[in-house]
């Protein structure tokens, strides 16, 4: 429990350190808050990784400007990422299993991001910003992105996959160095 709490707190702090990507609409942000959840999923199993995703989003809720819908989507996508990674690693501990599970998780997270944004996030956002304005933000970068689905497939899906892979890379660089310390907490 202590390790889950500690990793959740780190994930929350990392969630607060989000930043914009120049080639994306300004409302799409990058953070590395899935990193502690992925580490937790490897160290303690997929349930712990999922709990870390849940706690960081619950902690972020009072500061949210999305009415909770962004946190719901972040939780769903984070769980889609850490569950397969943790399951693969739990079944057969090793770098290859961790890599395969992480790749499956990153692909699943990116595919689910399209559905999550299409059916949950953007319909709620249209209460504050017309759909036309949302699509126009994408069209500034790529004029051919003329429907929400095209925007999500062209921009959000690869962005989400890349975000997942960055988390995987960092995890692979640090996991062995910190895993022994985590066990003793």
Predicted regions and their residues:
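Loop-helix junctions at membrane interfaces
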Residues: 1-183
